[in-house]
Amino acid sequence: MLIPTRIKLNKSSQTLELGYADGQHFALPAEFLRVHSPSAEVQGHGNPILQHGKLNVAITQVQPSGNYALKLTFDDGHDTGLLTWNYLHQLGTQQAQLWQDYLAALSAAGQSRDPSESVVRLML
């Protein structure tokens, strides 16, 4: 298990910064963490539920959960789902691919990252 040696919430950039003893460093944006929350609300019960409109979401609180995870609270009220050390490290190492997959899923579903935007598909 890779446990971060440094955890910092950068409020100005809304990123959770994780540093590891081996020199790895990840900066995970709030939106990325929100749409990849391990909660049942996001992951469903075997069928992930696509999150949209989370462009401006912010992390309001970071709390340790025992010696194995973090609990994040977001300003949209979401506060369920524990991000284990292993899951956080996985998000960091796979961030680029996970983000591209998320953007592709949004596009395929006709959804937007922007909560003030609705995507309209014309049937021609």
Feature roles, as predicted:
Residues M1-L124:
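Motif-centric detector for short Cys/His coordination patterns
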